[in-house]
């Protein structure tokens, strides 16, 4: 029952008691004299409790989106502020427990893991040092820093050069070259694949800090460097710095790229957990990603544990991709900076998932999609969420007087 409903019932019950009391007085015996009239009783009900934002129009837009497409059987989203979940809704065949492949919406949690490792006083690791500081081998990319890699400014060719990363047809393992980072086959090992990436220079490589070039090998090298520095697997680091303190249920990294449609929604069906793909291999449910977004809104906390400093959170939002000379794009570390919607940062994925925070309003959200076939227009849900849903969410938030 709503607070308003409780207040109204309470007011009604008070008036009924007063009415019953007046009837008892009227029915009482007595002599011929009359008593002075009692002063009127004035009841002032408490003002109604403030109501939260009304996201019904946002819900309706999600329903309209899913009704208007044959590509997707379900969609869901969750909104948070610094205190917790403020709204969530599922549509179609989605439930609150639906687990999806995140693709590039893995990037923000990956950066969170790296920043938390940097803050760990028991591990020698800095995103500002060349990766060769920590790796037991040299190579053309050993002089690049993790900070440059996770801001897509390392000079290592990104996904634009994917066709020249290697040959998935072999005939030898070496022919895979940089494509080893996208394989869940047990013949590929996480750290040895990282060594392949560092030591095999790609065409059109540039000096660090000159150009923005999204995704690819630079992200994998960053994750491998962290694992070597900490003497731990990547998923051990994710569990140590995010999973355990935040109480995450399913969040983990694998490597589904060779056959994403083989993922059934269960953790057990996720391929490649021993060779996880850093930039795009994570899975999550709504509750887990909601907790990760809260960290960016409450000063770095999961419950009573601070998993990231405010300085690290702020550093992730600083534009690094938009200040280079070539192909400049407003990008922090993991976050795309939405210059057309000030204060909004997003992390969209190839399968259609998107996360966002609005630092001006202190809110954030995550949208889940679970259609991984080639026939699905994964750009449609991303465009819908960023261009339509987020502005509608902001309007509902503002209308509530926040």
Predicted region positions:
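Short, well-structured active-site flanking segments
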Residues: 116-137, 229-256, 304-310
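Secretory-pathway/luminal and periplasmic proteins that interact with or process carbohydrate-rich
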Residues: 86-87, 138-147, 155-162, 232-235, ...
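C-terminal motif of bacterial Sec signal peptides marking the signal peptidase cleavage site
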Residues: 23-26
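Catalytic-site signature segments of enzymes, centered on catalytic residues
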Residues: 160-260, 276-290
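Active-site-proximal loop and beta-strand segments within enzyme catalytic domains
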Residues: 73, 94-214
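Structural recognition of the beta-strand scaffold that forms the well-ordered cores
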Residues: 76-79, 101-103, 109, 148-151, ...
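Catalytic loop of the DD-peptidase/beta-lactamase superfamily, centered on the K-T-G motif
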Residues: 31-89, 98, 230-232, 244, ...
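Bacterial N-terminal signal peptides that target proteins for export
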Residues: 2-16
